[in-house]
Amino acid sequence: HWADPVLAATGGTGVDLIIHHINKKKNNDNLKATAIMGRIINVGRLGGFNGNFDFDLHAARRIQYIGVTFRTRSIDEIRAITKAVQEDLGRDLGDGKLALPIDSSFDIEDVNDALARMKANEHFGKIILTLS
């Protein structure tokens, strides 16, 4: 359960915002890791389109759950969003203040193992493929 280290790191409070790409098996961990009055933004469904959802925990924490997609947005909207993200986060990403979690690294020859890990939804963070 990935929520446990998040709760430990925040003194049991949880985080104010989760930007989530996976869903399905991770829904309830997200709810557990989100602070009271926090927000979860669902931007992807890599783990599937359906899953368990603890409505009692959602209500008790008064969490805002926001769904977004780029499929129904125009090219101009996508460009504006990309520009805003770069302006808001670009410097911190470049300075190393923000970083994406790295789950694992595989040689390109082991791409099937990497894909199996991803399909099994066993990873937390990015899976990197390296070229020798």
Language-model regions, residue ranges each:
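Short acidic-hydrophobic, aromatic-tinged amphipathic segments that line or gate anion-handling sites
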Residues: 1, 105-109
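Adenosine-nucleotide cofactor-binding segment
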Residues: 1-26, 78-80, 84
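Generic hydrophobic alpha-helical segments
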Residues: 2-6, 89, 114
